[in-house]
Regions:
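Periplasmic plug
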Residues: 153
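Portal/gating segments that form or line small-molecule/metal binding sites
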Residues: 1-150, 160-205
Length: 205
C-alpha cells in the first residue's frame, strides 16, 4: 500500500487540533479549531474527496481515532459518512482491545498491540497492494512514519496562519528529506493545497 499523509498544517508547521476547540489541549494549546475559518468546501473538499477515492484504508493514532470514532458513526446516512464508516480502518494503540476497536467504529482493526507499531505498518505497506493507506491527523504517529521514511505522498493543506507552537509531523533529527512538488492548488481562503512525493535516494547516492 502507499502511505498518504493528509494534514491541515499552519505556516509554522503545526497540525494540532485543527478541527475543534477541545480536540487536543496538550501542552496548553489554546487554538483548537484554527483551520475551520479557512476551510474552502469547493477546493479543499474536492481534494479530500479525490484522495479518499484512491484510499483503500485509513490509519490513525489513538487520540485521533477516538475523536473520529465518537463522531462519524452518528452521521450515518450521509454519503461521505457512510464511506468513512465502511472503509477499512487501522488504529495504533497498546491499550485498546481488538473487540473494543471494532465495536466502537465499524471495520476497525488494531495495530501495534504487541508494541511494534512501525513494523506492523511496514508489513502492511509491503503486503497491502497498490491502494492508498491514508493517515489523518495523528501527529505523533505521522512524525514516526516520516522519521522511518514510510510516507509515499504528502497531501498538505498549508494554511495562512502562525500558531506559535504545537504538535508537528516533522522529526527533529537533522536529516534532510528532499520532496518533489507534484501539484499545488489555491483555495479562495488562501490555503495552498500541496501534494509532494519523497525523492528516494539510491543506495549508491
Amino acid at each position: 500500500m502507499r502511505i498518504i499523509l493528509s494534514d491541515f498544517i499552519s505556516l509554522d508547521g503545526v497540525v494540532q487540533a485543527p478541527g475543534g476547540k477541545d480536540e487536543d489541549r496538550d501542552g496548553g494549546f489554546q487554538h483548537g479549531g484554527w483551520s475551520m475559518p479557512l476551510f474552502d468546501p469547493e477546493a479543499m473538499g474536492a481534494v479530500v474527496g479525490e484522495v479518499m477515492d484512491r484510499t483503500d484504508a485509513l490509519l490513525f493514532g489513538r487520540r485521533t481515532w477516538d475523536v473520529m470514532a465518537a463522531a462519524w458513526p452518528e452521521r450515518a446516512g450521509d454519503p461521505y459518512a457512510d464511506q468513512m464508516n465502511s472503509i477499512r480502518k487501522y488504529v495504533v494503540s497498546r491499550t485498546l482491545s481488538p473487540e473494543e476497536a471494532s465495536s466502537r467504529w465499524n471495520n476497525t482493526a488494531l495495530l501495534g498491540g504487541d508494541g511494534d507499531a512501525i513494523e506492523a505498518i511496514r508489513a502492511l505497506r509491503r503486503s497491502g497492494g497498490n491502494g492508498g493507506l491514508q493517515v489523518w491527523g495523528s501527529a505523533s504517529l505521522a512524525r514516526q512514519l516520516v522519521e522511518h521514511d514510510l510516507v509515499d505522498e504528502y497531501c498538505l493543506m498549508l494554511e495562512p496562519i502562525l500558531l506559535g507552537g504545537g504538535k508537528t509531523i516533522f522529526p527533529s533529527d537533522r536529516r534532510a528529506r528532499p520532496l518533489e512538488l507534484v501539484s499545488v492548488k489555491q483555495a479562495k481562503t488562501g490555503v495552498l493545497i500541496c501534494t509532494y512525493h519523497p525523492v528516494r535516494r539510491s543506495a549508491n547516492a
